[in-house]
């Protein structure tokens, strides 16, 4: 058995195993096998003698010091598909990004400064910088606070995440086809208008009405074979466009994590997964997220992409979003975005006239506010509020 230091952390509405890169084999080709043994995923010999749980997917983060002046730490994210024994590191997890700053502070990778420490994170998956503002006390990250995140019980210490220049991390373009709206040919249906956007992660959006939905549906959709087949087809076709699968039919096994599917509709009143009423006036876009089943909230990377699309004319999200003149949803907390352009983009004059807007997404778990800063049709940054907490820290014994 191989002893490996490990930390189990909740970030937003997700959880992951965190490893320091120095504690893993130098040969990175050995990492996928180690991760699967650590999690005890299906068809690995570890089985019950591991950290795995009855989930179809698992998450792993590997952290190391950054070697340049533009960031403090490197963050490499891995999605483990236990049903297909597949490890994918082509995209990021926005929720788990919120745990990187607290972890880096507590591991001594970043000097703790009270009351707030700024951690600059280089996400190796998307090759983009994420800045994390973490509350600190007595040299460690705080876990207790009054921040509320939909989909997470109770309150916690706020972690503000800003995804810097999030467009084109996978494909090199915000809109990889060059179009704000494309049309997918779906057998037995009229061509489906979709928006393909690569922003924090690749996402495909379509309007609920175009699929015969109201947009307020919840878990009942999981048992509708016609709808699941439609989502699978749309995901597969989008995966092919994004370069994640050679054929759309391969996406179900070869790109189980990306792209996210977002279904958008105008603001409307509904009850969330916990039975709480969400008012139409509290949101700018009503949305639902799917991969193979309904997401209980809305993925953070997909939130950045959806909110950005809602600001850009010609997308399906813009078509259904509340316009400013129609009245804005209520403020959901002060986001630390002052509209100034900082960092490596500060010297670009075309970005100095950027505009920031609060976009509130109403989803299955409640509402999420995203501060989106754009310059024309370029996304400068997207900022969200999350919470994070360490669940366990210790030694994980992994079969050799």
Residue ranges with predicted function:
Residues 1-331, 335-339, 343-400:
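A glycine-rich beta-to-alpha transition motif near the start of alpha/beta enzyme domains, typified by
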